[in-house]
Amino acid sequence: MKKRDFPVSQIRRYLEPGPIVLVSSAFEGKTNIMTLGWQTVMEFTPSLVGCMIAGGNHSFEMIRRSRECVINLPTTKLTDQVVGIGNCSGATVDKFAKFGLAAAPATHVQAPLIAECAANFECRLVDDAMVRKYNFFIFEVVKAHVAASPKYPQTLHYTGDGVFMVAGKTISRRAKFRPEML
């Protein structure tokens, strides 16, 4: 999937309202992917994203130690991979190989991009004050890569009970916004 550079200050278009993401990590020569159902944009400049990663998750230690990751945005085409990745542990499985995903090199972090995803956000851990108590990591997006089209990809939104909603239809009210609120 061909990507173009994208301003990291504008990534909220891809992350709100909370799509399922695949978080890739790397540490000591090993890579992993986890499915993440909850993240939040916390600041626009610099672009900060908060993620809750369960302490028992294999990715937790990899990300805590490496202090970086890539937040990858899958579309509906990757629904089965999203579920499969969430149902196994990277401690025993190479998830890139098992789910037929291509690890592409990132430019600012060691963690790989997932080539098949519509967007990839390279992140560095900038605040771990809430990790010990809440497993809450705050990342700064240091590089953003997005597919040239579609502008608004069909993303997955987990509703629980094995059911996803699909984003895709857009309603524009751009003219009604104050410029600084866009």
Write out the residue ranges for each language-model feature:
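Basic, polyanion-binding surface patches
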Residues: M1-L182
